[in-house]
UniProtKB/Swiss-Prot annotation:
Name this protein carries in UniProt: D-alanine--D-alanine ligase
Organism: Yersinia pestis
A biological-process GO annotation: cell wall organization
Cofactor binding comment, as recorded: Binds 2 magnesium or manganese ions per subunit.
Pfam families given in the database record: Dala_Dala_lig_C, Dala_Dala_lig_N
Needed co-factor(s): Mg(2+); Mn(2+)
Length: 306
């Protein structure tokens, strides 16, 4: 009998709208590949009932909290339902940008200099103390919530007077915030499928950085795949991405985001364990360059589910 596959989409995180788009695309791709797949919006459907509804396998197309932070993965482990992407620990770890950095730092992998602040510290420090706290990083800075995806709550800080406002914005989304040294070079992303590294993509957003609008709404964001790197740099980037991915115990598929500075050095940003699969998304773009159609890509991801 053919496997019955649930494509989990929507959900309740700040990335719900993106997840709905990803899920519908995945669903169409799986059906095109001849797979018996059904869309399930977890906002309306309790995942604990998946097995009794006859589902044999789960394709996770949820983004953000509750979908790629280990919570859902734990439920699916308990239900003994195979699912796409990373397991509980890797999903939880990669959703936490601070702890991801701590692991990479311990292994000597390149990351941008940063300062971490929690809400209590933020509320007790004066504006002058905050500025002193990040003085060692130098301006400009990027401020981001530790647990949000899709660039939600992120701000660039060009002047010390802007730091307070950027932190207030970030703390609206999280109780832990990262302040990082701004890297002015290009951004790259590297998709990983199983243990295969797909061609890198160079991202050129229309604005200051690759924010939510640039990722999902703008038609002015430019993507270059092949990325234009030399063969040597492409191999170096691929090796770094795979090392960073395995350091966090990721599996199945994912995407590693990287910045390059003016001297050509790469710095790790984060890993996405349930990347976007919309018309603007990067993994399908890299897969096309690799020779995989969208339906072949989603079928391969599903095949890697365990």
């Amino acid at each position: 009998m053919a496997e019955k596959v649930a494509v989990l989409l929507g959900g309740t995180s700040a990335e719900r709208e993106v997840s709905l788009l990803s899920g519908q695309a995945v669903l169409a791709g799986l059906k095109e590949a001849g797979i018996d797949a059904y869309g399930v919006d977890t906002k309306d459907f309790p995942v604990t009932q998946l097995k009794e509804q006859g589902f044999d396998k789960v394709f996770i197309a949820l983004h953000g909290r509750g979908g790629e932070d280990g919570t859902l993965q734990g439920v699916l482990e308990f239900l003994q339902l195979p699912y796409t992407g990373s397991g509980v620990m890797a999903s939880a770890l990669t959703m936490d940008k601070l702890r991801t950095k701590l692991v990479w730092q311990a292994l000597g992998l390149p990351i941008s200099p940063y300062v971490a602040l929690n809400r209590q510290q933020f509320e007790t420090l004066s504006p002058e103390e905050l500025v002193a706290c990040v003085a060692k990083l130098g301006l400009p800075l990027i401020v981001k919530p530790s647990h949000e995806g899709s660039s939600v709550g992120m701000s660039k800080v060009d002047h010390a007077s802007e730091l307070q406002k950027a932190l207030v914005e970030a703390f609206q989304h999280d109780s832990d915030v990262l302040i990082e040294k701004w890297l002015s070079g290009p951004e790259f992303t590297v998709a990983i499928l199983g243990d295969e590294v797909l061609p890198s993509i160079r991202i050129q957003p229309p604005g200051v950085f690759y924010d939510y609008d640039a990722k999902y709404l703008s038609d002015k964001t430019q993507y270059f795949c092949p990325s234009g790197l030399s063969d040597e740099s492409e191999q170096q980037l691929a090796a770094l991405a795979l090392q960073a991915y395995h350091a966090l115990d990721c599996s199945g598929w994912g995407r590693v985001d990287v910045m390059q500075d003016r001297d050509g050095h790469f710095y790790l940003l984060e890993v996405n364990t349930s990347p976007g699969m919309t018309s603007h998304s990067l993994v399908p773009m890299a897969a096309r360059q690799y020779g995989l159609s969208f339906s072949q890509l989603v079928a391969r991801i599903l095949m890697l589910a365990d």
